[in-house]
């Protein structure tokens, strides 16, 4: 029996994402990893960064690719499949490339479990909607929302990958010290990698034009925007010669 779309879990999942994003803004605290891992309780177990990132990002990739593989439709036919392919591409990079290259600090078990639960839930929400609920007209590939959205998705992913690469080059293997990032969008903002991912998921939301995608983009903006804000404060506090003209997330504005 073919699986049909059930709107209630889709709307509930989307509302949960939006609520989580709003709560992040209300509480105004950064997630306790990386530069902010000092706030983690000393009794919490830590996982190696590479293993933690691989395992926590893997569910989103497995869920999205699994749903694409099991459906009877052509992989690159309907727009929903192509859009889910973009989602899968992001998590392929996060799971199999970023996780193996990262030189970040160990992650607490609490942060790891939260991130894993998020990737499972959001992966199911986005994949389920695009495979079983999304209905696009035949001309969607020529629609401006799709074209502009895909452009910004690719642009944002490129910025994110490039910025992450620049951050890795600041630290030799085994080092835990911090240096001022220079070049690229880091010339203008402290959270260039965060800005790239925000642009990426906003592009995805535009191309998808769906409630789950916009809820995910909103959550990403809130979560990574908060991280960028506290990263900026961290740099200003640590480095007396930190560029005063550099903003936290949005060039020349914020």
Swiss-Prot record:
Underlying gene: Srd5a2
Listed Gene3D superfamilies: 1.20.120.1630
Subcellular location field: Microsome membrane; Endoplasmic reticulum membrane
Gene Ontology annotations of biological process type: androgen biosynthetic process; biphenyl metabolic process; bone development; cell differentiation; dibenzo-p-dioxin metabolic process; female genitalia development; hippocampus development; hypothalamus development
UniProt topology in membrane: Multi-pass membrane protein
Residue spans crossing the bilayer: 8-28, 72-92, 146-166, 206-226
UniProt catalytic activity: a 3-oxo-5alpha-steroid + NADP(+) = a 3-oxo-Delta(4)-steroid + NADPH + H(+); 17beta-hydroxy-5alpha-androstan-3-one + NADP(+) = testosterone + NADPH + H(+); 5alpha-pregnane-3,20-dione + NADP(+) = progesterone + NADPH + H(+)
InterPro entries: 3-oxo-5-alpha-steroid_4-DH, 3-oxo-5_a-steroid_4-DH_C, SRD5A/TECR
GO cellular component: cell body fiber; endoplasmic reticulum; endoplasmic reticulum membrane; neuronal cell body
Source taxonomy: Eukaryota, Metazoa, Chordata, Craniata, Vertebrata
UniProt source species: Mus musculus
Protein name listed in UniProt: 3-oxo-5-alpha-steroid 4-dehydrogenase 2
């Amino acid at each position: 029996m073919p699986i049909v779309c059930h709107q209630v879990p889709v709307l509930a999942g989307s509302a949960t994402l939006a609520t989580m994003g709003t709560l992040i803004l209300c509480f105004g605290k950064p997630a306790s990893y990386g530069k902010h891992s000092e706030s983690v309780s000393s009794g919490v177990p830590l996982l190696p960064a590479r293993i933690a990132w691989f395992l926590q990002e893997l569910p989103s990739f497995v869920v999205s690719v699994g749903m694409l593989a099991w459906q009877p439709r052509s992989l690159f036919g309907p727009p929903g499949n192509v859009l889910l392919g973009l989602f899968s591409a992001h998590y392929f990079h996060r799971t199999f490339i970023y996780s193996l290259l990262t030189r970040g600090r160990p992650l607490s078990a609490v942060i790891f479990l939260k991130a894993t639960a998020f990737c499972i839930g959001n992966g199911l929400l986005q994949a389920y909607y695009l495979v079983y609920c999304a209905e696009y007209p035949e001309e969607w590939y020529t629609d401006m929302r799709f074209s502009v959205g895909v452009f910004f998705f690719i642009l944002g992913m490129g910025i994110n990958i490039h910025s992450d690469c620049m951050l890795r080059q600041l630290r030799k293997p085994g080092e835990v010290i911090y240096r001022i990032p220079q070049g690229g969008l880091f010339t203008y903002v402290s959270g260039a990698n965060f800005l790239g991912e925000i642009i990426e998921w906003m592009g995805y939301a535009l191309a998808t034009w769906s409630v789950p995608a916009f809820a995910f983009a909103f959550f990403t903006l809130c979560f990574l925007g908060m991280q960028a804000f506290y990263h900026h404060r961290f740099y200003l506090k640590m480095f007396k010669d930190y560029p005063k003209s550099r903003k936290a997330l949005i060039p020349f504005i914020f």
